[in-house]
A protein has these predicted regions:
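Short helix-loop-beta junction
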Residues: 33-41
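Divalent metal-coordination and catalytic microenvironments
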Residues: 18, 42, 71, 154, ...
C-alpha cells in the first residue's frame, strides 16, 4: 500500500529477519501478514546459512535493529527431497551447483543426527527439522547475534495445510 511505501522511502526498519527457502510457496510477508519494510527476508534453496547469509543477518540485527530472527523451513522442500531421494549419494560427484546445496543439506542433517543419536535412515520430515535446527544453531552461535540478545525461533511451514509449527 502507498502508506507503507511512503513510510519506508527513507530507510527500512524491519522488526524481524526471516531466513527461509526460495520455494515460491513460502512467502513470509503473506504467511505472517506483514507489509513493506516489516521483514528482512533472506531466501535460498533449503534455507541454508552461508557466510553471505550470516552477513545479511548480522546487518539486519546490527544496523537495522531487528529484534527477532525466524528460521522458517517447510514441508516438501526440494533441497531436502533431493538429499532424501539420493540413495546412491550422487551429489558427491559435484556435477553442478545443485549438488553443492544437497551436499550442505547432507552435512547438516548428519551433524544433527550424530548429536541427537537419531536413526541414520533418510526420513524426510526428520531431515527437514534437522535442517531447520542446524540453521538455527549457526545463528545462535554468532557473537553479534548473542551480543544483541536477539530472539531466535525455529518454525516449519506445511505447504499442504498452510499451518506453521514452532520447533
Amino acid at each position: 500500500n502507498k502508506k507503507s511505501v511512503l513510510n519506508n522511502q527513507n530507510g527500512q526498519h524491519p522488526f524481524a529477519v526471516i531466513v527461509t527457502c526460495s520455494d515460491s510457496r513460502v512467502a513470509p510477508e503473506i504467511l505472517f501478514d506483514q507489509g513493506i519494510g516489516d521483514l528482512f527476508v533472506i531466501r535460498n534453496a533449503g534455507n541454508l546459512i552461508s557466510d553471505i547469509d550470516m552477513g545479511s543477518i548480522e546487518y539486519a540485527v546490527e544496523h537495522l535493529d531487528a529484534k527477532l530472527i525466524v528460521v522458517l523451513g517447510h514441508t516438501e522442500c526440494g533441497a531436502i527431497k533431493a538429499y532424501v531421494g539420493d540413495k546412491n549419494n550422487d551429489y558427491k560427484k559435484h556435477r553442478n551447483h545443485i549438488d553443492d546445496i544437497v551436499q550442505t543439506v547432507a552435512e547438516e542433517v548428519e551433524e544433527i543426527k550424530e548429536q541427537k543419536h537419531v536413526p541414520k535412515e533418510k526420513n524426510e520430515l526428520g531431515c527437514i527439522n534437522a535442517n531447520i535446527e542446524h540453521s538455527t544453531k549457526i545463528i545462535k552461535n554468532n557473537p553479534i547475534i548473542k551480543a544483541h540478545k536477539t530472539k531466535i525461533v525455529s518454525m516449519r511451514y506445511d505447504v499442504h495445510t498452510g499451518k506453521i509449527t514452532f520447533l
